[in-house]
């Protein structure tokens, strides 16, 4: 989520994001023009429409967001969704006006060089919420699974 906001900003997108109360200012500082506080409102109940919706944490669905997509709009999710629906919808919606895409991560050199450039230009900063020593990796995983993390969790492999 925090990386996506910064990358979208780099490309000049107008960004509306969804976060909890404690993260609103952080998300705005990364480039979001408007932030919906999900503890106060359901962003799917508003009337604005978007070219792209990215669900970076798997809290929504194509079906909840479809009416928010403009004609030709695309819903991305980083999660498989209920019964792996996002993977299947990415195939089914190929011929529809509003699509779902399920991104499959790759490690191509072009993407790595782009992130290097953005970092060197000072237009990207890693948001690191917590650092766990390797022997606490189970606790780190449990924390990530709560869905309450902001940014990244780092596992420190070597002490010192």
Question: Where do the protein language model's features map onto the residues?
Answer:
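Terminal helix/beta-alpha structural elements that buttress the NAD(P)+-binding lobe
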Residues: 1-160
């Amino acid at each position: 989520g925090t990386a996506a906001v910064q990358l979208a900003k780099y490309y000049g997108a107008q960004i509306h994001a969804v976060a909890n109360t404690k993260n609103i200012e952080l998300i705005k500082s990364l480039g979001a023009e408007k932030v919906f506080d999900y503890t106060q409102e359901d962003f799917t109940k508003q009337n604005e429409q978007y070219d792209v919706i990215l669900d970076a944490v798997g809290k929504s669905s194509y079906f909840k967001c479809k009416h928010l997509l403009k004609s030709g709009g695309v819903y991305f999710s980083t999660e498989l969704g209920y019964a792996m629906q996002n993977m299947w919808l990415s195939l089914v919606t190929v011929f529809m006006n509003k699509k779902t895409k399920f991104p499959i991560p790759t490690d191509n050199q072009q993407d790595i060089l782009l992130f290097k450039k953005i970092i060197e230009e000072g237009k990207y900063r890693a948001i690191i919420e917590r650092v766990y020593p390797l022997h606490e990796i189970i606790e780190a995983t449990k924390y990530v699974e709560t869905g309450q993390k902001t940014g990244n969790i780092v596992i420190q492999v070597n002490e010192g």
